[in-house]
Amino acid sequence: MASQADSLCFTDVPPIAADVARGVTRLFCRQDLFAVCEMPLPNGRRADLMAIDAKGGLTIVEIKVAKGDLIGDCKWRDYLEYCDRFFWAVPPHLAQFLEEERYLPGEAGLIVADRYDAAVIRQAAHRPLPAARRKAELLRFARRAARRLSAQIDPSLGDSN
């Protein structure tokens, strides 16, 4: 059986990124949203976290833990067509930078997190996905989550794209 370390996401990132993901996941769980980490998207991008709510709403979270990484990120708009809501998640020291217009404060939400918890500082705008896209994304999400659970039972099944 796979070891716990083999099954965890965010194993090749700075520990602070895994801490932010953990805090966001705890917050989402309290809000009845459940996340899959490092979720591949059809456009070749990979969402740090993608969560589903009880009504099938999809939320993508992009985690940033360094100012340089945040400023250099030009790909995040590519996530918007695959979710109903989009959030940035950052440690407390980066929150101020996400007020800049280029980060669409009227559209993108902001979560500040550490390894213990997280708080929504700015709510994300709700932009409902078209029905056909929603169906495709929900199916993809479910299959990815199921595949990861199957790999827990038999590691040879892996978690390939």
Task: Annotate each PLM feature.
Residues 2-33, 43, 99, 103-161:
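Non-catalytic C-terminal interaction segments of nucleic acid-processing enzymes
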Residues 8, 65-113:
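Catalytic cores of nucleic-acid endonucleases
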Residues 20, 45, 71-75:
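Amphipathic coiled-coil/heptad-repeat helices and related helical stalk/stem segments
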Residues 28-30, 53-54, 80-82:
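Flexible, charged surface loops at secondary-structure boundaries
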Residues 36, 50, 111:
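Residues in well-ordered beta-strands of folded domains
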Residues 38-40, 62-68:
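Short, flexible loop segments at the rims of nucleotide/cofactor-binding pockets, characterized by
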Residues 43, 47-60:
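Active-site beta-strand-loop-beta-strand hairpin of nuclease catalytic cores
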Residues 58, 95, 117-119:
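Flexible, glycine-rich phosphate/dinucleotide-binding loops
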